């Protein structure tokens, strides 16, 4: 490995960490503003009704989910719809960390008191924008720029690994 390759790898890792941190910040804000939709079915309903307000689509799957043919078909359809409607897409490679981020806020809410039901479907998460203020949010702007740069490099659905805390 040459010095240039080592330096480029380090920069890429640092950049991915920054993008992961920005994603955490966007999710935290979306939870507090209630501008988040969780679940494949719920996401499909929202995309059908109001695609113009969706600013980010997250698809989360681990290695076990990669063998789920039905889920992969859903992902393909959602990706196609998002590309057609200029919605940025990110693939999250560690859905466990995504669950931690999304369920920390909801544990104290009514969902936790319903008893031991099935865990929520976190395979698809949509972030909507209630106002035209998306460009004022630096974390969301960073994610949008990252998605745009990835598309320029023919990586239409970039994979993000959320940093463990």
Curated annotation (Swiss-Prot):
Keywords: Cell cycle, DNA damage, Growth arrest, Nucleus, Phosphoprotein. It holds the Pfam family Ribosomal_L7Ae. One of its GO terms (cellular component) is nucleus. It is found in: Nucleus. GO terms for molecular function: kinase binding; protein heterodimerization activity; protein homodimerization activity. Signal peptide: none annotated. Interacts with AURKA, PCNA, GADD45GIP1 and MAPK14. Might affect PCNA interaction with some CDK (cell division protein kinase) complexes; stimulates DNA excision repair in vitro and inhibits entry of cells into S phase. In T-cells, functions as a regulator of p38 MAPKs by inhibiting p88 phosphorylation and activity. Belongs to the GADD45 family. This is Growth arrest and DNA damage-inducible protein GADD45 alpha. It comes from Bos taurus.
